[in-house]
Amino acid sequence: MANQKTALKGSEILKNIEDLKKRKFFHLELKGLTKPTRDILSELVNGILDEIGANPLAGFHLFSGLMEALLNAIKANIRHIIFRDELLKKLEQGETSRQDAEELLEIIMETSLLRDAMHRYIVPDKVKKQVQTVLSLEDKIRTKKKVLTESEKVFLSDVRSKIEKYNMNISLKIRITKEELSFRIRNDSPIHHLDFERIQESRQKHKELFDQGNSADFFRPEFLNEKESAGFGIAMIDEGFYSIGLNPLDLLTITSGARTTTVYMKYPISGLKMDF
């Protein structure tokens, strides 16, 4: 974590947590959501909420939304790594050399139009399944539920090494002012253009249901396909905003660049203090 040119590691953050809670700006660089990382974030964010005097229900929805946004960022980075691998396999087919395929891959990954076009050649369910496998294996390690097989260890090690190789991080910035508590979550992978459009459409439909007094209906089975393809995690965050009387379309913004995706979440201090 960096703040005013001070960098602290996890154990140091916990030791200094009472002083840190009084600061107005934080910048954390995350590799994943390990239990120690979750504990640090819980202590820090809930400490800030206590300092603000936030309603416990509002605090619950805020922290749940933040964890969901960070999990989305982690999944996006993993998905990007797996997409790269699958695309490289496609490019190596035929008489293309490994070196030529890798050079072409870099050109594609740096060009949004080419990168988006290549999605049609990669089976989405295959990528999704591998992402879920990575998350499942990480969870088994975290909870010590199961000893991984050799093939599982190799697969997970390969993904981890590529995340390190391509320096795929998650940046979390927290800022507190008199008016609002805001978060900026940035991961090192762009959103596919069509996925971005579907997310926006999905959020609008969710808002329409909320306006009708039925926002929870968005999570019924008839919306299953939309949840899977258009940002179920974002829908969960939006629902948290609705639950505390706030409009997420005004307070949660998603932007995507050539190499990154950024989520901005803003919570008015007055809204966090309200009784529900």
State where each predicted segment sits.
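Conserved, well-structured beta-alpha core segment at the onset of a catalytic domain
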Residues: M1-K89, G245-F276
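Short amphipathic alpha-helical surface micro-motifs
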Residues: A7-I13, S151-F155, E164-M168, A235, ...
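Residue-level detector of functional hotspots within protein domains
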Residues: L14-N16, I48, L156-R160, I237
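Active-site-proximal flexible loops/turns
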Residues: R79, L194, G240
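Glycine-rich/acidic phosphate-handling loop/turn and adjacent ATP-lid/helix
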Residues: E86-G231
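Conserved glycine-/histidine-rich ATP-lid loop and adjacent helix of the Bergerat-fold HATPase_c
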Residues: S229-L251
